[in-house]
């Protein structure tokens, strides 16, 4: 097993904690499987905590109840595609939920996810919650999905301008 730990902090001046995380691991057929998820409700939007907790609950259910059915026939690429499809369905469900209730009209959350199968892994992300690879140098594994990042990649902003841009 891999030692994991998680915690959240409401931060300064926030009325609610919109963060949620998930750490799950299991051994099956001599292989270790780990799912680590961080969701950050979008602070400028109402009820981000509903979105972030919903994402975590669906992914927890997937890991605990669905992943290990038929696992013998799946490689890590198929698991990754299954998760991408699930994240798309989660997004569609969040959009439907947000349209049904006034209080959740503009809810949203970022997502960064690490999945490990023994000696292989992949990372998925939505939004600007980052995943880093730490060795002697800190490296980004993910790219922010923000307008400022798009402008930076297109050459319309410098790195310094992008860090100060309100669209980051």
Predicted features by range, described:
Residues 1-168:
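PP2C/PPM-type serine/threonine phosphatase catalytic domain
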